[in-house]
């Protein structure tokens, strides 16, 4: 799957590992019951090779955003962090954010975690982002969590 689409879709289904504190900084979440499912696909010339070879994967219970992160929510973040809002077209402030990078998405997760008094999940170690799955803050879903949710297996 194209990395840009993966970032967009994962942000759309932003996973959350905490409980609500403030409606302004806390999108509605749902709990997904974990299970085993068949992930990936068989050889297909239209599918990237890293998505091939279907195999069974087990995901644990996780939480995920019920709705997309909106333009309005992203504006709140960029304004608070004094960042430039992306030059994008949208229909309304309730439209989902798009055309952002994976780094933008994890920085948003850390910002949202801090706003809610939670431990940020992502940190930079040796110039690379590392995910601390033991932290109680917001994070993006893993590839398996995303695929499980995207297939409607929740």
Language-model segment annotations:
Residues 21-24:
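Boundary at the C-terminal end of the N-terminal hydrophobic targeting segment
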Residues 36-46, 57-154:
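Active-site microenvironments of metalloenzymes and redox enzymes
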Residues 47-52:
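C-terminal, low-complexity/hydrophilic appendages and adjacent surface loops
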Residues 1-9:
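Bacterial N-terminal signal peptides that target proteins for export
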Residues 8-16:
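Bacterial N-terminal signal peptides
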